[in-house]
Amino acid sequence: MSDGEGEQFFNLEGEDILRLESRLKNPRNDGQIGKNPRQRKEDQAPQEEPKKTTRRPDKNKGLSQLEQLILKYVEEESCQDALKDFGGLIANIRQAHQAELTSHLEKVATEHRANLQALTKSQQEHEKVSKEILSAVIAIRSNLNENHSPRPKPLDPDQVKAARALGFGIGYRTALNVFDRIKGVTPDNAGSQEVKNMAIRAAEEDEYEGSPTFFRKVIDAVKKRMKQGQ
């Protein structure tokens, strides 16, 4: 070091000497002498933040769940082969499941149709029995109403005419038989209105051919008629 350089090195101002002495008396813990305030300000200047690098797009974006799963455990070079094998396996499983499901549905449908047919047949039989029971109840009710009716059931006019005709025929034949046993009786006397009326009354009173009371009434009427004719 030359004399000129030494003079320049020790050519310090008073403030610099005082600051240097203060630093020497109170050294820093790290053993370094404090820097110039200008340098410290420069050191404290905010540093520029490093530029954020743009994130690379996810290479799994747009892939199916199966492809993402395969890429997670299989190398990318073998991904296509693995994807093809797994796809075929899944297709076989799906096809087998579909066939099993179809068979099950067909079995259930067959059982359902059989149960429906049995139910329909049972319902038809039930309706038939119900109709028979209903008819029997209606018949029983009708018989009870007829037998226990407070008002007598009126006779059918045709039945009345038939009964009168039957009674008249029986009574008329009986009168003729009686007249045949009495001498002096002509067919005109046997066919008189009085004898006809008597025969009808006897028939209405249920006195038919062979009844002693009926014969007696007929004979008395004939005798009365004969006396009136004398």
From Swiss-Prot:
Annotated region (Disordered), positions in chain: 21-62
InterPro entries documented for this protein: Rhabdo_M1 (IPR005010)
PTM comment: Phosphorylated.
Intracellular or extracellular location(s): Host cytoplasm
Feature: compositional bias, Basic and acidic residues: 39-61
GO CC annotations on file: host cell cytoplasm
Signal sequence, start to end: none
Keyword Phosphoprotein belongs to the record: yes
Keywords: Host cytoplasm, Phosphoprotein, Viral RNA replication
UniProt key word Cell membrane: no
Family designation: Belongs to the novirhabdovirus protein P family.
Task of the protein: Essential component of the RNA polymerase transcription and replication complex. Binds the viral ribonucleocapsid and positions the L polymerase on the template.
This protein's name: Phosphoprotein
Gene for this chain: P
